[in-house]
């Protein structure tokens, strides 16, 4: 395997996480301990196996896991999340829905650091059980957890945490390193075929979940070109097809070719 040089920066990691990272809180059953379930926060980065070399180089805290054609960096240690992950994203902020997911995740970790008794667990469950828009969790699976809690302790009164009351600073302005990370994860440089006059049309695209449409609108403002479309697959797409915009606005943004994925091999 040819050795590659990588250019990991703080803002690149944030952009890359915006594309292919996630903040997850699982609720695991346990046989021992006071509570029948416990929350387990995880920070996850996922890539196709072809990016194995990059992920191995990027890997610091956490562990590497392989799943079919994917490689994942998963950080579950509460100390690593508290001392490495949270300080990073506090200083190099995400955008849109993923920023909101991060703040819920952070709130859960801080609550776990401050106490592990019953009321915080119920607050955590109420706060983040349905955070992930693609979750398979249902009201029935949530009820099953609550039933086990109430069967053991009886009905417990607790004060729910309102997400809108959490302190969320504004995102920093977009910069080049963030853009490179975002495109490394969710961007592409393609050629399309137009039926009219059988034209070949180059295009630059970035795709996000529809809940993060605002991120693409920020990119549109940053590059001062392109359009944002909502697709039927619950995703939104930012696209630049105008050749003048591609040459004068998009290509100069990436002229230094600081990509860390195999997009570095693309000819821009």
From Swiss-Prot:
The enzyme's E.C. designation: 3.1.-.-
Gene Ontology MF term list: endonuclease activity
GO BP terms in the entry: intron homing
The keyword Mitochondrion is assigned to this record: yes
GO CC list: mitochondrion
Database matches in InterPro entries: Homing_endonucl (IPR027434), LAGLIDADG_dom (IPR004860), LAGLIDADG_Endonuclease (IPR051289)
Enzyme class, first EC level, given as a word: hydrolase
Keywords: Endonuclease, Hydrolase, Intron homing, Mitochondrion, Nuclease
Compartment(s) where it occurs, according to its Swiss-Prot or TrEMBL record: Mitochondrion
Statement: the UniProt record of this protein carries the keyword Mitochondrion: yes
Pfam families assigned: LAGLIDADG_1 (PF00961)
Additional comment: Encoded within intron 1 (LRI1) of mitochondrial large subunit ribosomal RNA.
PANTHER family: INTRON-ENCODED ENDONUCLEASE AI3-RELATED
Known function: Mitochondrial DNA endonuclease involved in intron homing.
The name this protein goes by in its record: Probable intron-encoded DNA endonuclease 1
Gene field: hegI1
């Amino acid at each position: 395997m040819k050795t590659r040089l990588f250019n990991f920066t703080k803002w690149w990691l944030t952009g890359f996480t915006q594309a292919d990272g996630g903040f997850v809180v699982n609720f695991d059953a346990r046989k021992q301990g006071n509570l029948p379930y416990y929350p387990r926060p995880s920070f996850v980065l996922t890539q196709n196996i072809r990016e194995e070399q990059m992920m191995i180089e990027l890997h610091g805290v956490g562990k590497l896991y392989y799943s079919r054609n994917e490689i994942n960096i998963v950080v579950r240690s509460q100390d690593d999340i508290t001392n490495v992950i949270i300080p990073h994203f506090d200083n190099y902020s995400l955008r849109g829905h993923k920023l909101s997911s991060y703040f819920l995740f952070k709130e859960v970790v801080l609550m776990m650091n401050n106490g592990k008794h019953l009321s915080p667990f119920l607050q955590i469950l109420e706060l983040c059980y349905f955070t992930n828009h693609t979750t398979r969790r249902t009201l029935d699976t949530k009820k099953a957890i609550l039933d086990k809690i109430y069967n053991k302790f009886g009905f417990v009164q607790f004060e729910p945490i309102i997400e809108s009351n959490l302190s969320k600073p504004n995102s920093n302005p977009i910069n080049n390193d963030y853009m490179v990370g975002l495109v490394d994860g969710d961007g592409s440089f393609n050629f399309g075929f137009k039926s009219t006059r059988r034209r070949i049309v180059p295009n630059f695209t970035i795709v996000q979940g529809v809940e993060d449409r605002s991120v693409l609108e920020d990119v549109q403002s940053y590059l001062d070109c392109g359009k944002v479309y909502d697709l039927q697959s619950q995703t939104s797409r930012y696209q630049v097809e105008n050749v003048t915009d591609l040459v004068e606005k998009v290509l100069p943004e990436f002229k230094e070719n600081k990509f860390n994925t195999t997009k570095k091999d693309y000819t821009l």
